[in-house]
Curated annotation (Swiss-Prot):
GO biological process: isopentenyl diphosphate biosynthetic process, methylerythritol 4-phosphate pathway involved in terpenoid biosynthetic process
SUPFAM superfamilies: 1-deoxy-D-xylulose-5-phosphate reductoisomerase, C-terminal domain, Glyceraldehyde-3-phosphate dehydrogenase-like, C-terminal domain, NAD(P)-binding Rossmann-fold domains
Function: Catalyzes the NADPH-dependent rearrangement and reduction of 1-deoxy-D-xylulose-5-phosphate (DXP) to 2-C-methyl-D-erythritol 4-phosphate (MEP).
Organism: Bacillus anthracis
Residues the record lists as binding 1-deoxy-D-xylulose 5-phosphate: 123, 149-150, 174, 197, 210, 215-216, 219
Cofactor(s) required for function per UniProt: Mg(2+); Mn(2+)
Gene for this chain: dxr1
Any one Gene Ontology molecular-function term assigned to this protein's record: NADPH binding
Pathway where this protein functions: Isoprenoid biosynthesis; isopentenyl diphosphate biosynthesis via DXP pathway; isopentenyl diphosphate from 1-deoxy-D-xylulose 5-phosphate: step 1/6
Name of this protein: 1-deoxy-D-xylulose 5-phosphate reductoisomerase 1
Keyword Manganese: yes
EC number annotated for this UniProt entry: 1.1.1.267
Catalysed reactions listed for this entry: 2-C-methyl-D-erythritol 4-phosphate + NADP(+) = 1-deoxy-D-xylulose 5-phosphate + NADPH + H(+)
Length: 385
């Protein structure tokens, strides 16, 4: 069966890896739609190669520019409406959500309403609105297939298993670019230092989130919704080699782990062709060459963002959306070298402390909380500067 795929965020690291997978298996995958933010040069090349029916970019100006540069019959749209148009295109049956941040929420929700299966790589969608997204998927008979290597690993480990027999999920973490630094050393580190991830090729925002361990916190929150497991049963373990992508421990003491070379094309290909596997030419795992694997507990005093994620997830309501929004603002300013590394965690803490929670929020309440938190975090950082 051919999968007809729309990719939200086709010019980012996940999107380009996904298109590598499509190119490797053209008999199995066809591209229907693509979206980019501002990188229309790369999008133009992708349009020529994959000839999608529809694409979307950030602004009308970029859309107008792109129209002058392509000769295909591809429809060109823009903005949030454009994202939604790509996500809900009638010719697609699978949507890869790989845009960065909460901007992936609305198109994912609309895609589910249109009865599309979702290959989900956008963490923030489940962080901010996990209860809404998972319920919509159930109502519409849609599959949420994880793309993150950690969640793909758990998904594969649980294949054919009974969720009631799970004792705990163990999500592995590389530890990020600053894993071997002391708090004192981290005080003066800049974005350029954080962007050197030890194991994975990732976008800038995600690499900073990895350095603070907020990325791992988001993955814990994501796992709670993807697998319907309480936070008390989700553990994090530092594993510097990034060979074991996650583990599941069962009530009888048995542990199943999923291993593989750190290459995002593998979980993407698994998600695209689920429930069956395809051959690949990607690097194969050789444990004899690796020799040994190492594990340790995360240091929550050194990396408090992971603890914040657990606490906000347990509180629920709009609190996770507030956490996410404050992190997005602080992360972006750190990338511009406008704030210090520790200002990220301080901004998140103060913003979460200042908000008033709403239990079982509607989508509108979540979006309002997102906007409030962005403004509050911005004001905190403006006052600081």
């Amino acid at each position: 069966m051919v999968k007809y795929i729309s990719i939200l965020g086709s010019t980012g690291s996940i999107g380009t890896s996904a298109l590598d997978v499509v190119s490797a298996h053209p008999e199995h995958f066809k591209i229907v739609g693509l979206t980019a933010n501002y990188n229309i040069e790369l999008l133009e090349q992708q349009i020529k190669t994959f000839q999608p029916r529809i694409v979307s970019v950030a602004t009308k100006e970029l859309a107008d520019t792109l129209r002058t540069r392509i000769s295909t019959n591809t429809k060109i749209t823009y903005g949030t409406d454009g994202l939604i148009a790509v996500a809900t295109h009638p010719n697609s049956n699978l949507v890869l959500s790989s845009v960065v941040g909460v901007s992936g929420l609305l198109p994912t929700i609309e895609a589910l309403k249109a009865k599309k299966d979702i290959a989900i790589a956008n963490k923030e969608t489940l962080v901010a609105a996990g209860h809404i997204v998972t319920e919509l998927a159930k109502q519409n008979g849609c599959r949420l297939i994880p793309v993150d290597s950690e969640h793909s690993a758990i998904f594969q480990c649980l294949n054919g298993e009974n969720n009631k027999e799970i004792d705990k999920l163990i999500v592995t973490a590389s530890g990020g670019a600053f894993r071997d630094k002391t708090r004192e050393e981290m005080k003066t580190l800049q974005a350029k230092d954080a962007l050197k991830h030890p194991n994975w090729l990732m976008g800038a925002k995600l690499t900073i989130d990895s350095a603070t361990l907020m990325n791992k916190g988001f993955e814990v929150m994501e796992a709670r919704w993807l697998f319907d497991i309480p936070y008390e049963k989700i553990n994090v373990m530092i594993h510097k080699e990034s060979i074991i992508h996650s583990l599941v421990e069962f009530i009888d003491g048995s542990v199943i782990a999923q291993l593989g070379a750190p290459d995002m094309r593998m979980p993407i290909q698994y998600a695209f062709h689920y429930p069956t596997r395809l051959p690949s030419s990607y690097e194969k795992l050789n444990l004899l060459e690796i020799g040994s694997l190492h594990f340790e507990k995360p240091d929550l005093e050194k990396f408090p963002c992971l603890q914040y994620a657990y606490e906000c997830g347990k509180i629920g309501g709009i609190t996770p959306a507030v956490l996410n929004a404050a992190n997005e603002i602080a992360n972006a300013l750190f990338l511009k070298n406008e704030i210090a590394f520790f200002d990220i965690e301080k901004t998140i803490y103060k913003t979460v402390e200042a908000h008033h929670n709403v239990k079982d929020p509607s989508l509108d309440a979540i979006l309002e909380a997102d906007q409030w938190a962005r403004q509050y975090a911005n004001q905190l950082l403006i006052k600081k500067s």
